[in-house]
């Protein structure tokens, strides 16, 4: 009997409800795995229908078409002589489960339902599925007739079960189960399971790869064994980008690493590993062995098939390797770029339209598109036929082969500087120079005529003409005049996106890109239905701090020196009149806080789950060397006042690439009301009382502080009760 096994895992760019495309990608991955000598192939979570079907899981069609794809896979000669592990939704006794279906040679060996469902952040699995809660128990699943006719089986095992081959034992985890405190791999490993598989639907978040790799290596470090992780990759229909990172680990070390960001629709990893290395590693850990004697056994499905071959002495084994991580700046350069590529080719539009202001945010969006063009050119040069076909379809030229990212950018990206009488020459120059360097088709236009026309209608109807504060107007007039400019830019962006190519004699329309960052969205520092309103936003989930680091990275990586000028310029909306030809409006002055402070507020609010009072308490210590308690209180109250006042803007926010755990995305990730009492009277009074106590304590002698300590504090609610008449 052999001792070396060759196993395969993969990352597939599946698309929700694209059953034909998903089927072909699954089939191709199996074919590649067999070609590399693998005897077991693992695919991503729910790969047959695509992970992001959301409420389509409620539809019987989704279940039906998934079964049809499974039948097609079972019937294909490609799937013969290799154990195939695929993911799909299954209805069992009128309950819907997220399942793995494991089959070999037209026979379904077992169905393993997911036991721990992801239901936080962007995940809502409990809305569509039920977890299997019967540990180490199985039932008989009655196959639909279309499968009975094909497999000649009436029922198959369904439940928490492992697979015993002639030479080893394989157990399944599904995505979230790896992240739970009591992961199934622990008991499975103690019960003699030597190979653990994990089919994931895990999306990208900046700096998340470290956690994923640590979980896998730790799982095999404490308990020994081989661990395969498969994941989806790409944009499968919404704000999330699934970032691959397929991997194979053994005994705490990585033996195969997949790409995190790639335009390849199918990526297959294989490793040849020695089962005796697993057995000797496990047997040496005496504390593990003692626990193994107490573990309850798993039901086993046996199969007359081996993952090893009998004559394998000369078969080379894979070597351990160090995982290569991307810097956050690289992640921003690659993740959103791949997401944009998927969105563009699958939407069948002809390119992007980007309002380019000359500031950091729109420059970052432009750089992401340029990075996308670089990835496309590299993929074509490496022989990726699918990318070549896609780009030929986009430019409507069957003989076209992209060679230069700048030339491709000129075909796919139209940028536009929309000047007003409040715009400076500096921002105009920076926008024009950046467009020249990346090669985009660039337009310069003035919005003043449109602004005057809109204000003329208002003046005609009311007999009044609003003025800026600099010209003696009120704050209401000042804000209205700023918003008119911003909203006209949005209208013009959509007009030019729809007709720009038509005016040039080319086919198709363009997707409008937004450039509002996550910090400005959190505070509401944007005009509702301005240029933040777009089709998609590649930077909407990224903080200003990370964006500045990313733009600095692009300046060096892509040799774009104008980005240094953009970084050194003050952030400004340029919606108010210039003062002696110079910009007088600064973003951080308008907001009343710095972008760095705003990032801290965002993380405390969402990640640390801090309301106004808790945030104040945390910041007292964090900012003790920079601000007094009174100043901290003022900043916290200002943030929550503005945040709650502007929360309604999140309900119409442009769909943005999800990249941060403190995103205020109202769609699914950050569910909050949008009508608040913006005075926060109870919460702010708690803060004010704490400030008074701190100030009083600072002015007291030591004896007075001791006496104060033993006084009964006045309850907060007594201060809020109505006073007696």
UniProtKB/Swiss-Prot annotation:
Tissue: Highly expressed in small intestine, kidney, liver and testis. Weakly expressed in skeletal muscle, spleen, lung, heart and brain.
Cited PROSITE patterns: CN_HYDROLASE (PS50263)
Keyword terms: ATP-binding, Ligase, NAD, Nucleotide-binding
GO molecular function terms listed in the Swiss-Prot or TrEMBL record: ATP binding; glutaminase activity; NAD+ synthase (glutamine-hydrolyzing) activity; NAD+ synthase activity
Residues at the active site: 45, 114, 175, 357
InterPro entries linked: C-N_Hydrolase (IPR003010), C-N_Hydrolase_sf (IPR036526), Gln-dep_NAD_synthase (IPR014445), NAD/GMP_synthase (IPR022310), NAD_synthase (IPR003694), Rossmann-like_a/b/a_fold (IPR014729)
GO biological process: 'de novo' NAD biosynthetic process from L-tryptophan; NAD biosynthetic process; NAD biosynthetic process via the salvage pathway
Physiological role: Catalyzes the final step of the nicotinamide adenine dinucleotide (NAD) de novo synthesis pathway, the ATP-dependent amidation of deamido-NAD using L-glutamine as a nitrogen source.
Family to which this protein belongs: In the C-terminal section; belongs to the NAD synthetase family.
UniProt name for this protein: Glutamine-dependent NAD(+) synthetase
Gene: Nadsyn1
């Amino acid at each position: 009997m052999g001792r070396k096994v060759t196993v395969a895992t993969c990352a597939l760019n599946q698309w929700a409800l694209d059953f034909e495309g998903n089927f072909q990608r699954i089939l191709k991955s199996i074919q590649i795995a067999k070609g590399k000598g693998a005897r077991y192939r693992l695919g991503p979570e729910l790969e047959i229908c695509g992970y992001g079907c959301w409420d389509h899981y409620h539809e019987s069609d989704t279940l039906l078409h998934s079964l049809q794809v499974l039948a097609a896979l079972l019937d294909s000669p490609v799937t013969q002589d290799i154990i195939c592990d695929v993911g799909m939704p299954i209805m069992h006794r009128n309950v819907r489960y997220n399942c793995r279906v494991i089959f070999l040679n037209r026979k379904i060996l077992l169905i393993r339902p997911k036991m721990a469902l992801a239901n936080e952040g962007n995940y809502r699995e409990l809305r569509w599925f039920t977890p299997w809660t019967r540990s180490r128990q199985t039932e008989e699943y009655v196959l639909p007739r279309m499968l009975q006719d094909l497999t000649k089986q009436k029922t198959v095992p369904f439940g928490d079960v492992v697979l015993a081959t002639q030479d080893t034992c394989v157990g399944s985890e599904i995505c979230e189960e790896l992240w739970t405190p009591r992961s199934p791999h622990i008991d499975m490993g103690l019960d003699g399971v030597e190979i653990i598989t994990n089919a994931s639907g895990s999306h990208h978040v900046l700096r998340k790869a470290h956690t994923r790799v640590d979980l896998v290596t730790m799982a095999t470090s404490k308990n020994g064994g081989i661990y395969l992780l498969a994941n989806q990759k790409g944009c499968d229909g919404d704000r999330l980008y699934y970032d691959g990172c397929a991997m194979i680990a053994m005994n705490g070390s990585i033996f195969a690493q997949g790409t995190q960001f790639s335009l390849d629709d199918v990526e297959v990893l294989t490793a040849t590993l020695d089962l005796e290395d697993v057995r000797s590693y496990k047997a040496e850990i005496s504390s593990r062995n003692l626990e193994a004697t107490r573990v309850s056994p798993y039901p086993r499905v046996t199969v007359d098939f081996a993952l090893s071959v009998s004559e394998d002495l000369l078969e080379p084994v894979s070597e351990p390797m160090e995982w290569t991580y991307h810097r956050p700046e690289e992640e921003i350069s690659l993740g959103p770029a791949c997401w944009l590529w998927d969105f563009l080719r699958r939407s069948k539009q002809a390119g992007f339209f980007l309002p380019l202001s000359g500031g950091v945010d729109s420059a970052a969006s432009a750089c992401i598109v340029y990075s996308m063009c670089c990835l496309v050119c590299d993929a074509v040069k490496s022989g990726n036929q699918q990318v070549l076909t896609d780009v030929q379809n986009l430019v409507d030229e069957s003989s076209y082969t992209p060679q230069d990212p700048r030339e491709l950018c000129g075909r796919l990206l139209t940028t536009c500087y929309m000047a007003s009488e409040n715009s400076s020459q500096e921002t105009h120059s920076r926008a024009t120079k950046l467009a020249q360097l990346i090669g985009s088709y660039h337009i310069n236009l003035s919005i003043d005529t449109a602004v005057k026309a809109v204000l003329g209608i208002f003046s005609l109807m009311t007999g009044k003409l609003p003025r800026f504060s600099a010209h003696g107007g009120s704050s209401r007039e000042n804000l209205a005049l700023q918003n008119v400019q911003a909203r006209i830019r949005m209208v013009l962006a959509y007009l030019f996106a729809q007709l720009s190519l038509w005016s040039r004699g080319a086919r198709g329309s363009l997707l409008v890109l937004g450039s509002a960052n996550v910090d400005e969205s959190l505070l509401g520092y944007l005009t509702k239905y301005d240029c933040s309103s777009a089709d998609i936003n590649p930077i909407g989930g990224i903080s200003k701090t990370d964006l500045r680091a990313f733009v600095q990275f692009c300046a060096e990586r892509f040799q774009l020196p104008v980005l240094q000028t953009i970084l050194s310029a003050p952030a400004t909306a340029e919606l108010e009149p210039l003062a002696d030809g110079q910009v007088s409006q600064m973003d951080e002055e308008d907001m009343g806080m710095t972008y760095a402070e705003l990032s801290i507020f965002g993380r405390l609010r969402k990640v640390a789950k801090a309301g106004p009072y808790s945030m104040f308490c945390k910041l007292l210590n964090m900012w003790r060397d920079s601000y007094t308690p009174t100043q901290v209180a003022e900043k916290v109250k200002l943030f929550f006042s503005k945040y709650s006042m502007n929360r309604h803007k999140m309900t119409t926010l442009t769909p943005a690439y999800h990249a941060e755990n403190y995103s205020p995305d109202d769609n699914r990730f950050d569910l909050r009301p949008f009508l608040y009492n913006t005075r926060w009277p109870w919460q702010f009074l708690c803060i004010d009382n704490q400030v008074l106590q701190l100030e009083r304590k600072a002015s007291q002698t030591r004896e007075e502080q001791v006496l104060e300590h033993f006084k009964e504090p006045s309850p907060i609610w007594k201060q809020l009760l109505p006073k007696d008449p």
